Amino acid sequence: MPKKVQPTGDENEEASVPCKRVKEELPETLSVLNFDSPSSFFESLISPIKVETFFKEFWEQKPLLIQRDDPVLAKYYQSLFSLSDLKRLCKKGVYYGRDVNVCRSISGKKKVLNKDGRAHFLQLRKDFDQKRATIQFHQPQRYKDELWRIQEKLECYFGSLVGSNVYMTPAGSQGLPPHYDDVEVFILQLEGTKHWRLYSPTVPLAHEYSVESEDRIGTPTHDFLLKPGDLLYFPRGTIHQAETPSGLAYSIHLTISTYQNNSWGDCLLDSISGFVFDIAKEDVALRSGMPRRMLLNVETPADVTRKLSGFLRTLADQLEGREELLSSDMKKDFVKHRLPPFFEGNGTETMDPGKQLPRLDNIIRLQFKDHIVLTVGPDKNPFDEAQQKVVYIYHSLKNVRQMHMIGEEEESEIFGLRFPLSHVDALKQIWCGSPIRVKDLKLDTDEEKENLALSLWSESLIQVL
């Protein structure tokens, strides 16, 4: 039998109990977006721009402004978050720093006006009205069901974590100074009007957040007003600032962000150490020692640089045609921290694997494929000195929505299973998505076939048809 993946490394063979999910009421306004699939959702989100056009001409390249005059869409956007939502959430308990920030841009610098401890709506509204401060609410998808629904679909579409923030800014005020982010940004204008100015990046596709001074950013490449129902996209590194015009009502906009630490460089950092570890087992040259006293040198000698360059070329040659990379940290981090599947009602029926256990003659099919990753890695059993490779299945079905993207220091649990490497072909059969009979799985014995199906079924990863 495979073993459950536990964060402590204690991997016991015990079945899981399907979790129950408590949901709040859906917004009264019916969604005007298409949630049939991740692809159809993204297509409807950026409509009327075609998806092919977006990725060919705008993604990671330049901003896209979609201005709409659509009262139905504007009403739907308004339902995503409002001051009344903030008031309701304050009654339940929100805290400065973790849930909400109060800030204002003064002379090109961000001034934080947070108090300590729990945030009360009357105090927030006082700072909003009297100090002209912006209220920033972190990760509202933890509480607003429709945002959970939206961001879960986007995480499936991009295969990357998707966070969000709501910015509520009074008239004649600006919350943040000019800056750029390390994420791809989608702005949805929910209420009021916001004056945006975008500038050419000083660091294209930036890998970190930074504030830029006014004398460095030059003149805007884009200068426009965003109104309810409008959508704005810009790549990471795009310098931007926004203010609510004087004489108008307050502005509320939603920032949806993704692709943080999701570059080719991040992929190489994640993959290369495990790959070198694997190849060193086969290549004695990689296991030979470095020159004496090399670590004491102030500069790297030319012959050492040539040696390392040669090793890198060898690794590149070995990488060609290799199907399995000993890389799991990015996959594991994504699944561990992403949103669970969105469910209508309380979700208990969908999460229940059902009463029928999978037997040899049963046909099974994978479900929640976008919420599961399969990776090969060393056995984490502390008693396995040989460090044999095993197959890990990680999933997000039991992730806690209220913990999504809030950066708590506590180590959250990751859910999944562990199988012998001999099971990888059978798992790939299931992963193709087509229904398959249990007895047709590529395993040596009927017992192994049933045990594999039963383990996946116990985690609600497969359906018995």
From Swiss-Prot:
Residues 139-271 form the JmjC domain. It is found in: Nucleus; Nucleus, Nucleolus. Induction: Up-regulated in experimentally-induced cryptorchid testis. Fe cation binds at H179, D181, H240. GO terms for biological process: regulation of cell population proliferation; ribosome biogenesis. Predominantly expressed in testis. Expressed at high levels in spleen, thymus, and colon, but barely detectable in brain, skeletal muscle, and seminal vesicle (at protein level). Its cofactor is Fe(2+). SUPFAM superfamilies: Clavaminate synthase-like (SSF51197). PROSITE patterns: JMJC. Its EC number is 1.14.11.79. Belongs to the ROX family. MINA53 subfamily. This is Ribosomal oxygenase 2. It comes from Mus musculus. The gene is Riox2.
